[in-house]
Amino acid sequence: MSQATEFDYIIIGAGSAGNVLATRLTEDSDVSVLLLEAGGPDYRFDFRTQMPAALAYPLQGKRYNWAFETDPEPHMDNRRMECGRGKGLGGSSLINGMCYIRGNALDYDHWAKQPGLEEWDYLSCLPYFKKSETRDIGPNDYHGGDGPVSVTTPKAGNNPLYRTFIEAGKQAGYPETEDVNGYQQEGFGPMDRFVTPKGRRASTARGYLDTAKQRSNLTIETRAVTDVIEFEGKRAVGVRYEQKGQPKQARARREVLLCGGAIASPQILQRSGVGNPEWLKELGIPVVHELPGVGENLQDHLEMYIQYECKEPISLYPALKWYNQPKIGAEWLFKGTGVGASNQFESCGFIRSRDDEEWPNLQYHFLPIAISYNGKSAVQAHGFQAHVGSMRSESRGRIRLTSKDPHAAPSILFNYMAKEKDWEEFRDAIRLTREIIAQPAFDRYRGREISPGPDVQSDEELDNFVKQHAETAYHPCGSCRMGEGDMAVTDAQGRVHGLEGLRVVDASLFPVIPTGNLNAPTIMLAEKIADRIRGREPLPRASVDYYVANGAPAKQAS
């Protein structure tokens, strides 16, 4: 084994959280940091990861995607479902859909009601959302103007179907909101995106690491696959990893910071002897510390596509044609504008399916084309679709180690749709979506319903459609829950219970999945914990208003 090297901090995983920590910790010039990433660099010449409109490409193949699969999901016709996770500098921010959604204020207020998580209320989190962000139209009480992450807002003159979707939501009785990340998430409005002013994907590798990698106190090792965290007694003291087939070792003087994400973080903990002792003994792994919650509490968002043909030739369908792509690519490459510079998710909605929901439980992404997320099975016609999914399923799954081999995939079971409420929400989701698309705003555009199709009406027919066609939104989280109690893995600052010198900092900490996409909340969480690691005072709590429904009906009579 090569000579061990020593650093103050070792960060495992250069994803949305790990890159934040690497950048913030190395702002202190007397601190040395090693950042380990199992994937490769984020090649800036590769349009597949850099062009927002090409977001389907990195999900195909395994250069940038671990491309995990779930175990057969018992409530989903035993389908093995996709579980894509980013591989390379930027992690999943290198391959995600680039939607900049923070979640609902009440998500965080409800986290803060759990024992030990009092510091995670919305007004304590908002300053860290702002700290991380540069919004293209400037800062305000809810948005930042000088953070590492570029956020682009939709502009006038974009595809008319985006505005049509918002108008139809209003006609169906729902509110319009100017900013789903501002005062009021609930309603229909524009969707911001992680895209730079030059039309490039704003991954955390670009936003954070581009600054930090110039610093002499940061060492970045790519293609470095972590094997185990090493302990002396109950203290984490280093990491064993493999690089180009060679075993290597590094020691941490202060802390090991595990930022592998909701799949890899519990997997690495278990391989290192931290977790459910029964599971570890089955694999012959010596138990360093019993923590039965490692890998439990796994959550995700499921979603479906409700697709229609478009009667007017204004959808993005022509952009799929090979003969149109060179022009689109050239405009993006040289000007940073045009169809290539957008992820195409430019309007969205957050609604309550029933009056007794305290805050939105359904999310819409609207797309002016009919296609699946990974770019397959495009409808050969002008079309549009609404992606819809429930936000806070009570179903819980788990991540379980299958082998001591660091290259082996874990066993992943989300246990999707395990509760009766899941089925109620998805039936509501399909019926409410049809109601929205049936509004007068869509009359000029709405053609035949492609999917689920007009024949799918009864509860049983809708349930079968969900079983066969619902897909992951790629939002796994919760598998190393922060908090107190037997099943919590860390405290509110990511410190692993019962151990020293070890934190988990990523989406696996979320006790309950937020209402929306997970990249922005993951960056916020890492910014907040970075201050704790550095011994800095938390940023002062924000003092802004935010919308709470307080029993108002979910929709007004139209």
UniProtKB/Swiss-Prot annotation:
UniProt: FAD binding residues: 8-37
One GO CC annotation: membrane
Pathway in which the depicted protein is active: Amine and polyamine biosynthesis; betaine biosynthesis via choline pathway; betaine aldehyde from choline (cytochrome c reductase route): step 1/1
Keywords of the record: FAD, Flavoprotein, NAD, Oxidoreductase
Molecular function as annotated in GO: betaine-aldehyde dehydrogenase (NAD+) activity; choline dehydrogenase activity; flavin adenine dinucleotide binding
Flavoprotein listed as a keyword: yes
PROSITE patterns, per the entry: GMC_OXRED_1, GMC_OXRED_2
GO annotation terms (biological process): glycine betaine biosynthetic process from choline
Domain of life from the UniProt record: Bacteria
PANTHER family, per the entry: CHOLINE DEHYDROGENASE, MITOCHONDRIAL (PTHR11552:SF147), GLUCOSE-METHANOL-CHOLINE GMC OXIDOREDUCTASE (PTHR11552)
Name this polypeptide is given: Oxygen-dependent choline dehydrogenase
Annotated source species: Chromohalobacter salexigens (strain ATCC BAA-138 / DSM 3043 / CIP 106854 / NCIMB 13768 / 1H11)
